[in-house]
């Protein structure tokens, strides 16, 4: 199985006609994602033609063949949803328009909204997340790589050809570290990889993903990537202690970060002793998680945890 996303989900792309939207829509199509429409009020009625070829494991099984795919452009999300039956949206619009794009997707009945856009004002993000939560829609992001279930579907910008399917669940604040751990653990493979984003306000938390992986029968262990700043990792540690039965392996980026300086993401900032990588590592280890000091060490810990899971299953 997978979490949040299945191979049958139909996807629309808000901002598909822009350069980034067009580039990543093509990659999603090449991975086998069912992208069925784009949305741009100024280009309603147009059709965008994509050159596609299978990319990543499972693409051919999902029906991807070398050739072209035509994707229609609608003027509104509601119109696109009615015409295609889509319930998932990927958002590639500029930051100033992101709040209204999210609200439009929620009002149109999108159950999953993946917001790739970086630089959305915090007040806009707070409003949009509250609006979606009140209406039962899930936002992943903003400022995230999206969500991929290898050999099933891929919504966002995650490269589909760096890993395959397997028993590991991955939740991460960092896009590049998501890709690195996916590559380092390609021998095991993943049920789903969720990039939640590194902004101060995100729609899906570590805890949300941990709970979904705990409930997923095909996920045998979880790799969690955090970073300095805030208390998301400490809250995740409390959840791991109280609710996780599956092993959790973690990595916290930022052990050498200087105090008071934002490091990469808007939310990655240390203030005094609060939000340090060492404090987060200690909290996670106290909760029973195994924490690596580097991505490669984290991958090794994950392999060891998986061997123990397999050994326990064989002895049962």
Locate predicted features:
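Catalytic-core regions of core metabolic enzymes
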Residues: 1-316
């Amino acid at each position: 199985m997978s979490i949040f996303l299945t191979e049958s989900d139909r996807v629309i792309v808000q901002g598909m006609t822009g350069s980034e939207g067009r580039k990543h829509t093509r990659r999603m199509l090449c991975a086998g994602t069912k992208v069925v429409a784009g949305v741009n009020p100024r280009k309603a009625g147009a059709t965008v033609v994509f050159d596609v070829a299978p990319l990543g494991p499972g693409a051919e099984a999902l029906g991807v063949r070398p050739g072209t795919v035509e994707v229609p452009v609608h003027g509104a999300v509601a119109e696109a949803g009615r015409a295609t039956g889509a319930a998932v949206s990927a958002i590639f619009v500029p930051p100033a328009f992101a709040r209204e794009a999210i609200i439009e997707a929620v009002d149109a009945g999108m159950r999953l909204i993946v917001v790739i856009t970086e630089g959305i004002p915090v007040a806009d993000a707070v409003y949009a997340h509250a609006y979606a939560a009140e209406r039962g829609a899930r936002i992943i992001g903003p400022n995230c790589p999206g969500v991929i279930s290898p050999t099933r579907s891929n919504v966002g910008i995650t490269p589909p050809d760096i890993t395959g399917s397997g028993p590991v669940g991955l939740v991460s604040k960092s896009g590049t570290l998501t890709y690195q751990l996916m590559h380092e653990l390609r021998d095991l493979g993943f049920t789903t990889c969720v990039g939640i984003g590194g902004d101060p306000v995100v729609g899906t938390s570590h805890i949300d993903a941990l709970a979904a992986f705990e409930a997923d029968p095909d996920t045998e262990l979880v790799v969690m990537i955090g970073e300095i700043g805030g208390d998301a990792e400490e809250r995740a540690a409390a959840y791991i202690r109280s609710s996780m039965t599956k092993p959790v392996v973690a990595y916290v980026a930022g052990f050498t970060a200087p105090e008071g300086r934002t490091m990469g993401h808007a939310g990655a900032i240390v203030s005094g002793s609060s939000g340090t990588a060492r404090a987060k590592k200690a909290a996670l280890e106290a909760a029973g998680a195994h924490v690596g000091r580097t991505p490669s060490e984290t991958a090794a810990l994950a392999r060891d945890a998986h061997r123990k899971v397999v050994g326990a299953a064989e002895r049962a």
